Amino acid sequence: HAPATYRGWCRGRELADLGLLALDIDEADGGIGAGPVGTMLVSQATGAGLLLEPFLSSAVIATRVVSLLVRGTQREKLLGALASGEAIAVLAHEETEGWAQPLATTATSEADGWRLRGCKVGVLHAPMARWLLVTARTPDGIGVFVVDRQAEGVQLHAWRSVDGQHAADIEFDLSLADDARLGDGDERLLRRGPRWP
């Protein structure tokens, strides 16, 4: 049966079998590479059907973040798991002060990696996710960090939205390995605004 991490991802395998979880992944990375029009059409259909699964959160937004920032074996691992439905990843960016204010979540350098501290709010599908893609302010700009949802130092306050979707406010205070940061120059992600991608 499905691990607790993915409980509720009841249609994940079906969506993967249809290729929908690989829709927004480039063909060079083993995906379909349908582009924005194909993704929009599927999103329209899932919206009309009131699908509660994290198609937009994981198969579109998270895969776009990984595709933009990650190279090498880590890219292959993350995209492969997302495309197969083996794992869910969600972007944790919004904070209590909203998008217009500077990020309050910080990642400071440690001897063997990073110390991540802060709080994110309204993270859709976070209770179902395996990985949280967390934006944080670093000494050299904005970074995006991959964090295991069940790691010690990650505290979720789960709730349900009015349409029944799982969400959470999340507190972070934990150490991360050096390779938890996904790429460099990550501020380009934030220029896409709150309705990105």
Regions found by a protein language model. Name each.
Residues 26, 42, 71, 116-118, ...:
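Buried hydrophobic positions in well-ordered alpha/beta secondary-structure cores of metabolic enzymes
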Residues 23, 84-96:
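A short, Trp-centered hydrophobic/proline-enriched beta-strand micro-motif
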Residues 48, 154-197:
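Glycine-rich beta->alpha junctions and the first turn(s) of the following alpha-helix
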